[in-house]
Regions:
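Metal-dependent nuclease catalytic cores that hydrolyze phosphodiester bonds in DNA/RNA
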Residues: 1-39, 135-142
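Short, solvent-exposed loop/turn segments at secondary-structure junctions
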Residues: 28, 56-58, 93-95
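Conserved catalytic cores of phosphodiester-cleaving nucleases, focusing on short active-site segments
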Residues: 38-63, 78
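Electrostatic, structured charged patches in enzyme active sites and in nucleic-acid/phosphate-binding
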Residues: 22, 70, 94
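Coil-to-beta-strand transition motifs
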Residues: 33-37, 44-48, 84, 95-96
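Short, glycine/acidic-rich beta->alpha junctions
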Residues: 34-35, 69-71
Length: 142
């Protein structure tokens, strides 16, 4: 099992299991005048880390997946929710290779920008009086 592979790794095991660790920890925070909620897989108070466990079809492409699936937004929100740095522990579904991916300042900044834009869109669609979503379109230059 993939779980067994992760837990057989001493560093992973120490990050996941210790006396100062909480699991499936919920939180709510107000950012950009909207409430955001999340549930962290693991909050490790000893190491001051929020840890998310992910599987991937190809660990060599995880950095691309992290952008495609907005993991930068997740890392930004959860780091603000819990006040700790964010770490992804990833296991390849095919090879069972384990990866640990920490987050650069640029990764958090991209996440912050996406969260800000999402808040702006939410405000437009749900907080703007008489807004007609049928009249909404995006306009870009190629």
């Amino acid at each position: 099992l993939m779980r067994d592979k992760v837990m057989a790794n001493d560093i992973c095991k120490d990050l996941i299991i210790n006396s100062q660790t909480e699991y499936e920890k919920p939180g709510i925070i107000n950012m950009f005048n909207n409430n955001w909620k999340g549930k962290a897989d693991i909050v490790n108070h000893e190491e001051k880390l929020v840890i998310d466990l992910k599987t991937t079809a190809d660990i060599d492409k995880f950095q691309w997946s992290a952008s495609k699936f907005n993991y930068d937004s997740q890392a930004y929100i959860y780091s603000k929710l819990f006040g700790y740095e964010f770490l992804f522990i990833v296991i390849d579904k095919n090879t069972h290779q384990i990866g640990m991916f920490d987050c650069s300042p640029q990764f958090y900044e991209r996440g912050e920008e996406k969260v800000r834009k999402a808040s702006e869109a939410y405000d437009l669609f749900y907080k703007t009086k008489d807004f007609d979503p049928k009249q909404y379109f995006i306009s870009k230059t190629l």
